[in-house]
Protein backbone atom coordinates (compact mmCIF):
# COMPACT_ATOMS: atom_id res chain seq x y z
CA UNK A 1 0.00 0.00 0.00
CA UNK A 2 1.60 3.28 -1.05
CA UNK A 3 1.30 6.03 1.53
CA UNK A 4 -1.00 8.70 0.15
CA UNK A 5 -1.31 11.21 2.95
CA UNK A 6 -3.92 9.35 5.04
CA UNK A 7 -3.86 6.41 7.40
CA UNK A 8 -6.14 4.24 5.26
CA UNK A 9 -7.61 4.62 1.78
CA UNK A 10 -11.22 3.30 1.85
CA UNK A 11 -12.77 1.31 -0.98
CA UNK A 12 -16.26 -0.06 -1.67
CA UNK A 13 -17.16 -3.75 -1.52
CA UNK A 14 -17.51 -3.77 -5.33
CA UNK A 15 -14.05 -2.31 -5.81
CA UNK A 16 -12.67 -4.73 -3.27
CA UNK A 17 -14.11 -7.72 -5.13
CA UNK A 18 -12.30 -6.69 -8.33
CA UNK A 19 -8.91 -6.99 -6.71
CA UNK A 20 -9.79 -9.85 -4.35
CA UNK A 21 -7.30 -12.31 -5.85
CA UNK A 22 -4.35 -9.95 -5.44
CA UNK A 23 -5.56 -8.87 -2.02
CA UNK A 24 -5.95 -12.44 -0.78
CA UNK A 25 -2.45 -13.34 -2.02
CA UNK A 26 -1.01 -10.29 -0.28
CA UNK A 27 -2.84 -11.00 2.99
CA UNK A 28 -1.83 -14.67 2.90
CA UNK A 29 1.83 -13.68 2.56
CA UNK A 30 1.66 -11.05 5.29
CA UNK A 31 -0.27 -13.20 7.80
CA UNK A 32 1.79 -16.37 7.31
CA UNK A 33 3.79 -15.69 10.53
CA UNK A 34 0.56 -15.99 12.56
CA UNK A 35 0.78 -19.75 12.19
CA UNK A 36 -2.61 -21.17 13.14
CA UNK A 37 -5.15 -21.39 10.32
CA UNK A 38 -7.98 -19.92 12.43
CA UNK A 39 -5.83 -16.95 13.43
CA UNK A 40 -4.90 -16.27 9.80
CA UNK A 41 -8.59 -16.48 8.82
CA UNK A 42 -9.68 -13.82 11.32
CA UNK A 43 -6.72 -11.69 10.39
CA UNK A 44 -7.89 -11.78 6.77
CA UNK A 45 -11.47 -10.88 7.76
CA UNK A 46 -10.22 -7.99 9.91
CA UNK A 47 -8.04 -6.52 7.14
CA UNK A 48 -10.86 -6.73 4.62
CA UNK A 49 -13.15 -4.92 7.05
CA UNK A 50 -10.63 -2.12 7.57
CA UNK A 51 -10.53 -1.47 3.82
CA UNK A 52 -14.29 -0.93 3.50
CA UNK A 53 -15.94 2.48 3.66
CA UNK A 54 -16.91 3.82 7.08
CA UNK A 55 -15.32 6.10 9.66
CA UNK A 56 -15.70 3.72 12.61
CA UNK A 57 -13.10 0.93 12.67
CA UNK A 58 -14.17 -0.87 15.85
CA UNK A 59 -14.82 -4.61 15.72
CA UNK A 60 -18.58 -4.06 16.07
CA UNK A 61 -18.65 -1.54 13.23
CA UNK A 62 -16.63 -3.86 10.99
CA UNK A 63 -19.10 -6.68 11.71
CA UNK A 64 -21.93 -4.54 10.35
CA UNK A 65 -20.07 -3.82 7.10
CA UNK A 66 -18.61 -7.28 6.53
CA UNK A 67 -20.80 -9.92 8.24
CA UNK A 68 -18.59 -13.00 8.27
CA UNK A 69 -18.49 -15.18 11.37
CA UNK A 70 -19.17 -13.62 14.77
CA UNK A 71 -18.00 -10.51 16.59
CA UNK A 72 -16.53 -12.47 19.51
CA UNK A 73 -14.02 -14.24 17.26
CA UNK A 74 -12.97 -10.94 15.70
CA UNK A 75 -12.57 -9.35 19.13
CA UNK A 76 -10.45 -12.30 20.25
CA UNK A 77 -8.11 -11.72 17.31
CA UNK A 78 -7.53 -8.01 17.93
CA UNK A 79 -7.46 -8.08 21.76
CA UNK A 80 -6.20 -11.02 23.88
CA UNK A 81 -4.97 -13.33 21.10
CA UNK A 82 -1.23 -13.91 21.84
CA UNK A 83 0.40 -13.52 18.44
CA UNK A 84 3.73 -11.82 17.77
CA UNK A 85 3.46 -8.60 15.77
CA UNK A 86 7.13 -8.05 14.88
CA UNK A 87 7.40 -10.84 12.24
CA UNK A 88 4.41 -9.29 10.43
CA UNK A 89 6.01 -5.87 10.36
CA UNK A 90 9.33 -7.32 9.25
CA UNK A 91 7.60 -9.14 6.40
CA UNK A 92 5.87 -5.91 5.40
CA UNK A 93 9.15 -3.97 5.54
CA UNK A 94 10.87 -6.55 3.35
CA UNK A 95 8.03 -6.31 0.84
CA UNK A 96 8.32 -2.51 0.84
CA UNK A 97 12.06 -2.89 0.20
CA UNK A 98 11.31 -4.95 -2.90
CA UNK A 99 8.82 -2.32 -4.09
CA UNK A 100 11.26 0.56 -3.43
CA UNK A 101 14.65 -1.02 -4.26
CA UNK A 102 16.57 2.27 -4.53
CA UNK A 103 15.42 4.46 -1.63
CA UNK A 104 16.32 8.12 -1.56
CA UNK A 105 15.56 8.48 2.14
CA UNK A 106 13.93 7.07 5.22
CA UNK A 107 11.37 9.54 6.52
CA UNK A 108 10.17 9.76 10.12
CA UNK A 109 6.69 11.23 10.64
CA UNK A 110 4.00 11.45 13.33
CA UNK A 111 0.63 10.99 11.59
CA UNK A 112 -2.60 11.57 13.49
CA UNK A 113 -5.91 9.73 13.24
CA UNK A 114 -8.97 11.79 14.30
CA UNK A 115 -11.33 10.06 16.73
CA UNK A 116 -14.78 10.97 18.03
CA UNK A 117 -14.70 8.88 21.21
CA UNK A 118 -12.33 8.52 24.16
CA UNK A 119 -11.83 4.76 24.51
CA UNK A 120 -9.40 3.97 21.67
CA UNK A 121 -5.93 3.39 23.13
CA UNK A 122 -3.84 6.56 23.09
CA UNK A 123 -6.65 8.90 22.10
CA UNK A 124 -6.40 12.37 23.64
CA UNK A 125 -6.73 16.00 22.77
CA UNK A 126 -3.30 16.58 21.25
CA UNK A 127 -1.57 18.19 18.29
CA UNK A 128 -1.70 16.31 14.98
CA UNK A 129 0.55 17.30 12.11
CA UNK A 130 -1.79 15.44 9.76
CA UNK A 131 -4.71 17.63 10.84
CA UNK A 132 -2.58 20.74 11.35
CA UNK A 133 -4.21 21.49 14.69
CA UNK A 134 -4.92 20.22 18.19
CA UNK A 135 -7.79 17.73 18.14
CA UNK A 136 -9.14 14.54 19.70
CA UNK A 137 -6.98 11.94 17.97
CA UNK A 138 -4.48 9.11 18.14
CA UNK A 139 -0.90 9.89 17.11
CA UNK A 140 1.71 7.43 15.91
CA UNK A 141 5.40 7.66 15.07
CA UNK A 142 6.04 6.18 11.63
CA UNK A 143 9.05 5.36 9.46
CA UNK A 144 8.73 5.39 5.67
CA UNK A 145 10.94 4.25 2.79
CA UNK A 146 10.85 6.85 0.01
CA UNK A 147 11.99 7.33 -3.58
CA UNK A 148 10.99 9.57 -6.49
CA UNK A 149 7.69 7.68 -6.96
CA UNK A 150 6.40 7.97 -3.42
CA UNK A 151 6.78 6.29 -0.05
CA UNK A 152 5.46 3.40 1.99
CA UNK A 153 5.62 2.69 5.75
CA UNK A 154 8.23 0.40 7.27
CA UNK A 155 6.74 0.56 10.75
CA UNK A 156 4.63 2.40 13.32
CA UNK A 157 4.72 2.99 17.07
CA UNK A 158 1.59 4.27 18.81
CA UNK A 159 2.24 7.32 21.00
CA UNK A 160 0.65 7.04 24.46
CA UNK A 161 0.11 10.33 26.33
CA UNK A 162 0.86 10.25 30.06
CA UNK A 163 -2.80 9.86 31.00
CA UNK A 164 -2.68 6.46 29.29
CA UNK A 165 0.51 5.20 30.96
CA UNK A 166 0.17 6.74 34.42
CA UNK A 167 -3.56 6.19 35.03
CA UNK A 168 -4.20 2.47 35.54
CA UNK A 169 -7.95 3.07 35.66
CA UNK A 170 -7.81 4.24 32.06
CA UNK A 171 -5.01 2.17 30.57
CA UNK A 172 -5.86 -1.11 32.29
CA UNK A 173 -9.35 -1.69 30.84
CA UNK A 174 -7.99 -0.82 27.37
CA UNK A 175 -5.29 -3.48 27.66
CA UNK A 176 -2.27 -1.22 28.17
CA UNK A 177 0.30 -3.39 30.05
CA UNK A 178 1.30 -2.11 33.49
CA UNK A 179 4.99 -2.13 32.55
CA UNK A 180 4.50 0.29 29.63
CA UNK A 181 5.98 3.68 30.55
CA UNK A 182 5.55 7.05 28.89
CA UNK A 183 7.85 7.63 25.92
CA UNK A 184 8.08 10.94 24.03
CA UNK A 185 7.97 11.01 20.24
CA UNK A 186 11.75 11.16 19.93
CA UNK A 187 12.32 8.03 21.99
CA UNK A 188 9.67 6.15 20.01
CA UNK A 189 11.38 7.26 16.79
CA UNK A 190 14.75 5.94 17.98
CA UNK A 191 13.23 2.61 19.03
CA UNK A 192 11.50 2.29 15.66
CA UNK A 193 14.75 3.09 13.82
CA UNK A 194 16.72 0.55 15.88
CA UNK A 195 14.11 -2.12 15.23
CA UNK A 196 14.13 -1.49 11.48
CA UNK A 197 17.94 -1.39 11.28
CA UNK A 198 17.96 -4.79 12.97
CA UNK A 199 16.12 -6.26 9.99
CA UNK A 200 19.16 -5.73 7.73
CA UNK A 201 17.28 -3.68 5.15
CA UNK A 202 19.21 -1.56 2.65
CA UNK A 203 20.03 1.77 4.27
CA UNK A 204 19.29 4.96 2.33
CA UNK A 205 21.80 7.82 2.08
CA UNK A 206 19.52 10.24 3.92
CA UNK A 207 17.25 10.14 6.96
CA UNK A 208 14.60 12.84 7.38
CA UNK A 209 12.28 13.75 10.24
CA UNK A 210 9.11 15.83 10.22
CA UNK A 211 9.76 18.96 12.25
CA UNK A 212 6.13 20.18 12.27
Where are these regions (language model features)?
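Conserved, well-structured functional cores that handle cations and Mg-NTP chemistry
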Residues: 3-6, 10-212
Amino acid sequence: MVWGGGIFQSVTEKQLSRCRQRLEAFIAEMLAPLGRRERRHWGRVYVRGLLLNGERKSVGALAERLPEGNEQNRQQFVSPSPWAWEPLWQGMAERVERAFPNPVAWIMDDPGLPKTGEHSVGVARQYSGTLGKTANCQVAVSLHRSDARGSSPLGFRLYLPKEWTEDAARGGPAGVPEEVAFQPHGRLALALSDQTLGWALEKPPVGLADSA
